[in-house]
């Protein structure tokens, strides 16, 4: 039986993408993940995550979805972040099931739930994959929990790959934009980068999530200044 873990990295930052990853492995091989020292990606160093990512990609089956800031900005005009995440989670799950050509079988899917209502999150996710369940005659057990990345090795694996992938993207951004900080809205370096960029270019960078309060504050401040000048 195949087990799948799904998690994301970069849900909260004001800069950069959200990376969603589904990781699958045969249930009887789950012990191999524990032997690798797989755990919550936030407890691992950046170098350790990068090292484990390579090992995990060779050990199991991986499907990723990278939602750049521009796509998140566009999607948030019509749906909220939870819906964006559920859509991405269901997409990687379905892609992985198709890639592995799983039919007439049992699957367990473990998810790190973003919503405060884990049951609602679980039901929404199941609705999104209902078509592939029927089409392929699958018996699927879904476990959606908070901090699943700290409880289930298969989710930890997905978390590590997603986080390491995002680390690489942020490093690339730093080569282009300079010191952008951590990308989190509470980071003074990130706030300064956004303010300085806006001051110089009269717009926010493409890597900024415009629906976040940090960006809205900069845009609102600019509008108020313009009104005062006029």
Curated annotation (Swiss-Prot):
Protein's gene: rnhB
Record's cofactor remark: Manganese or magnesium. Binds 1 divalent metal ion per monomer in the absence of substrate. May bind a second metal ion after substrate binding.
Protein name: Ribonuclease HII
Family from the record: Belongs to the RNase HII family.
One GO location term (cellular component): ribonuclease H2 complex
Keyword Magnesium tagged: yes
Effect after changing residue 112 to N: Reduces activity 600-fold
Location of this chain's protein in the cell: Cytoplasm
